[in-house]
């Protein structure tokens, strides 16, 4: 896929496995292209999912929908499990269809310290700071154990 904004940057030379300069198929100009990412897994947190893996994102989906399509397998974590009938009544609201999903896990407050509109709409600033500090200090495992204790 062609991308703009990379001319003059070192990214093209530093990461040739991702970027390539080629002649545009539409003009005589050169364009920078980027290799499509194909992750093994995507883990996406949603507001609602059914037992089969149909999932709804009730707010901004950011890149989650694209990730579900790019990944070889997707795990959905959800605030709550709902009846499949809800998806059948309004199929256009299905953000991720079941056939892209390998597993569904119910994880209330699974997006914290971030947000999951409309269930919780404020970023937990203290939680974000603690998360950042844990990464900086190499203590992410300890942090995750602390914030997930008693939730399984």
Which role fits each region the language model picked out?
Residues 1-152:
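Conserved alpha/beta enzyme-core scaffold
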């Amino acid at each position: 896929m062609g991308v703009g904004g990379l001319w003059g940057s070192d990214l093209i030379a530093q990461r040739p496995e991702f970027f390539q300069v080629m002649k545009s198929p539409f003009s005589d100009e050169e364009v920078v292209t980027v290799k499509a990412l194909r992750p093994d897994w995507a883990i996406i947190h949603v507001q609602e999912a059914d037992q089969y893996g149909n999932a709804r994102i009730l707010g901004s989906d950011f890149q989650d929908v694209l990730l579900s399509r790019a990944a070889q397998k997707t795990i959905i974590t959800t605030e709550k499990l709902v009846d499949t009938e809800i998806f059948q009544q309004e199929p256009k609201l299905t953000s991720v269809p079941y056939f892209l999903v390998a597993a569904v896990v119910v994880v209330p407050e699974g997006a914290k310290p971030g947000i999951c509109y409309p269930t919780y709409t404020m970023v937990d600033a203290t939680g974000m700071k603690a998360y950042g500090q844990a990464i900086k200090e190499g203590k992410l495992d300890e942090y995750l154990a602390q914030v997930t204790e008693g939730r399984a």
